[in-house]
């Protein structure tokens, strides 16, 4: 049994939507990133890679590589699942916390969970996503960006 932690953050930029957990959410900003900026899937990918002692997404999908420019983070997450599987591990469960003042996440969380469960090839009850604010404190409270913490439990395949 292995446990991994992932953390990622992206700052806001010009745009009119963000993508979190594979879900396109209307917003007054976009997220600045080399890929699609899905900070939730990036943190989950890091948690999975960390649990398997396989580094992080920067190692596997460097932002200096043009092939990952604008990449769909769901495709990257599925690739991470394949890497972890090849090392003899399967996902036990994942849990993530989105830290954002806005937009409101509650209307989108179930769809995020469904997308993530499909990409991880697990049941819905093995995926938890929740959201909180920092009560207008820090960079997320000032609506400068979004952060996500994620943990993953891996079991022998």
From Swiss-Prot:
Cofactor binding notes? Binds 1 divalent metal cation per subunit.
This protein's superkingdom? Bacteria
| Positions bound to 4-CDP-2-C-methyl-D-erythritol 2-phosphate | 8-10, 34-35, 56-58, 61-65, 100-106, 132-135, 139, 142
Gene3D superfamilies registered for this protein in UniProt: 2-C-methyl-D-erythritol 2,4-cyclodiphosphate synthase
Under Enzyme Commission nomenclature, its number is: 4.6.1.12
Q: Which reaction does it catalyse?
A: 4-CDP-2-C-methyl-D-erythritol 2-phosphate = 2-C-methyl-D-erythritol 2,4-cyclic diphosphate + CMP
Which cofactor does the UniProt annotation name? a divalent metal cation
**Sorted UniProt keywords:** Isoprene biosynthesis, Lyase, Metal-binding
**Subunit structure as annotated in this protein's UniProt entry:** Homotrimer.
Q: Which family does it belong to?
A: Belongs to the IspF family.
The name of this protein is 2-C-methyl-D-erythritol 2,4-cyclodiphosphate synthase
Q: Which gene encodes it?
A: ispF
């Amino acid at each position: 049994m292995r446990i991994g932690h992932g953390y990622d953050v992206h700052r806001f930029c010009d745009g009119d939507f963000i993508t979190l957990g594979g879900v396109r959410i209307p917003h007054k900003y976009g997220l600045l990133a080399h890929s699609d900026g899905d900070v939730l899937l990036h943190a989950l990918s890091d948690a999975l890679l960390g649990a398997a002692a396989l580094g992080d997404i920067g190692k596997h999908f460097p932002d200096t590589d043009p092939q990952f420019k604008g990449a769909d983070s769901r495709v990257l997450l599925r690739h991470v699942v394949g890497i972890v599987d090849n090392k003899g591990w399967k996902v036990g469960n994942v849990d993530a916390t989105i830290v954002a003042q806005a937009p409101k996440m509650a209307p989108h969380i179930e769809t995020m969970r469904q997308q993530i469960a499909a990409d991880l090839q697990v049941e819905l009850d093995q995926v938890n996503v929740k959201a909180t604010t920092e009560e207008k404190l820090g960079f997320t409270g000032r609506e400068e960006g979004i952060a996500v913490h994620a943990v993953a439990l891996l079991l022998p395949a």
